[in-house]
């Protein structure tokens, strides 16, 4: 039986009087990709921080494999434009990094040519590859990617999806990927979890390889890598985030 690296059981998180996450349960397994989808303010970043152990849940339980190695790619990296920082120096800022490990990590993500480039001059796609290389330095069992394609053009997104799939196969690691885009997700995702404070729905994504508009935009390669996840919600959320059942019109907390 495949081991479970991280298990969340009925996790809730409350900040003051505001409940950010409610009754979240999920499991992360080696070699599997779980994509979190949801609008801004849905609690995705909070859930990531719970998984990373940065904040404790207000209720529920979190169990992690002892000694679990995690690689994390943050949503945004803010660097002082006046700070002289090459990719090589940036990589060495990670504690315990050996200089000999830097070039192989960059090579793995096809970014070796960026070794001596200033971080501030990198494109969105190049920046994400460098962050990904840095996350790989500790040979992670779990790779957490927070909005990995934000600020990356369509071609760069396709390339990153290819790379994530390749790393999943090579490392056999679990991947937790976060997105706010409710329409486009990785076709190779094993499970999609739609979040809006609670789990709205979850399941395998649908590959839309025969959709003419999608093929016209991305081509057949894009159809293999991207998919539209069809939401089968039995409810919607009002402007205050409350649940409104579609059939009855009643609300839940």
Curated annotation (Swiss-Prot):
ATP binds at residues 38-45. Its EC number is 7.2.2.20. It holds the Pfam family ABC_tran. The keyword ATP-binding applies. One of its GO terms (molecular function) is ATP hydrolysis activity. GO terms for biological process: response to zinc ion. Residues 6-227 form the ABC transporter domain. SUPFAM superfamilies: P-loop containing nucleoside triphosphate hydrolases. GO terms for cellular component: plasma membrane. The complex is composed of two ATP-binding proteins (ZnuC), two transmembrane proteins (ZnuB) and a solute-binding protein (ZnuA). PANTHER family: METAL TRANSPORT SYSTEM ATP-BINDING PROTEIN TM_0124-RELATED, ZINC IMPORT ATP-BINDING PROTEIN ZNUC. This is Zinc import ATP-binding protein ZnuC. It comes from Yersinia pseudotuberculosis serotype I (strain IP32953). The lineage of its organism: Bacteria, Pseudomonadati, Pseudomonadota, Gammaproteobacteria, Enterobacterales.
């Amino acid at each position: 039986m495949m081991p479970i690296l991280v298990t969340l059981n009925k996790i809730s998180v409350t900040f003051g009087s505001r409940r950010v996450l409610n009754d979240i349960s999920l499991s992360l397994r080696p070699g599997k990709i779980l994509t979190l989808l949801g609008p801004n303010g849905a609690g995705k970043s909070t859930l990531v921080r719970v998984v990373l152990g940065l904040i404790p849940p207000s209720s529920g339980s979190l169990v992690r494999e002892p000694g679990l190695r995690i690689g994390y790619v943050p949503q945004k990296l803010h660097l002082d434009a006046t700070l002289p920082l090459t990719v090589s120096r940036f990589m060495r800022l990670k504690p315990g990094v050996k200089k000999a490990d830097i070039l192989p990590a960059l090579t793995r993500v096809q970014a070796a040519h960026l070794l001596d480039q200033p971080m501030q001059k990198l494109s969105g796609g190049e920046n994400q590859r460098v962050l990904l290389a840095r996350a790989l330095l500790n040979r992670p069992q779990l790779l957490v990617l927070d909005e990995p394609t934000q600020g990356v053009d369509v071609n760069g997104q396709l390339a990153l999806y290819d790379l994530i799939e390749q790393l999943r196969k090579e490392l056999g690691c679990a991947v937790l990927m976060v997105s706010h885009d409710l329409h486009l997700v990785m076709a190779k995702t094993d499970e999609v979890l739609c979040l809006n404070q609670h789990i709205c729905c979850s399941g395998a994504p649908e590959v839309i390889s025969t959709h003419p508009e999608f093929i016209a935009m991305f081509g057949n390669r894009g159809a293999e890598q991207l998919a539209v996840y069809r939401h089968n919600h039995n409810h919607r959320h009002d402007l205050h985030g409350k649940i409104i059942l579609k059939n009855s019109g009643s609300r839940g907390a």
